[in-house]
């Protein structure tokens, strides 16, 4: 978009402009923000970005809603994150403040924008600095409080929490044994919202990269494994001998027991169990609790190739020989940089784009 047009649009967004003119200009900007080129042009004009943030607090619901939708679109583009935070330093504090308001009608849009902004490590670090420990506690309370905001579902708090746990500081908060955070999240593995459910599974998967916490996660204080396996289990019959190896919550399931419907979530659940197999003690505990039986039946049922491959990796871990001496902890094995880069690229290609855009 022509820079001159950006400046012209900016003049229409001023408070003294007629409300209908301001609304039309904003509607045009919303359309522009739907393309990568449009987002690049908008982010090149700091005053326009500041005006958009101001308009998101407009008294006119239609104007405020469109402004929030533009912000969601802008934050969906990782290339725009640095410019957004540099040009609008009040963006994160302002959004977090409004998200905490239990009466905010645009909380879901704000939550989606914050989720977009926290995807990349650099902006996630900025987010955590703005949030503080107290803010993390508030986010958790909001996620766990039924109807915290009657006007919003706040389902994107799940993926937001997942993004924050890509960093050690975020994982440290979730894994704080004095806060019982993990235990509070486990019921949401059965949430009716795919977005929330997937975010919680992703959070747990990220936390399982901390191998020093595996014994605690698998122990009686958390007992994570049955929560991960139950969504992967169907209603297949097992022999009495096999049944006794399964955790109590997975025994004698109804014949019509349904597995997790979303293939991406099934894949993340399998990957989380695989991470728990990184240490020798973890592998022993996972093997002892009938995990192979659940994976065997899942593999026969599964139709999605990427989930089937993840299942095969875990089965190989469960039935394969133990690693040689010195390689018992698989999370501490050194991977050559070129191989690590290739594997990371393949993972990203398999996952696809993650940003949420308003169409």
UniProtKB/Swiss-Prot annotation:
Question: Which cysteines in this chain are paired by disulphide bridges?
Answer: none
Q: Which domain of life is it from?
A: Eukaryota
In terms of InterPro entries, this protein maps to:
ARM-like (IPR011989), ARM-type_fold (IPR016024), Hgh1 (IPR039717), Protein_HGH1_C (IPR007206), Protein_HGH1_N (IPR007205)
Recorded hits in SUPFAM superfamilies, A to Z, give: ARM repeat
Which Pfam families does the entry link to? DUF383, DUF384
Gene3D superfamilies membership: Leucine-rich Repeat Variant (1.25.10.10)
Q: Which family does it belong to?
A: Belongs to the HGH1 family.
What's this protein's name?
Answer: Protein HGH1 homolog
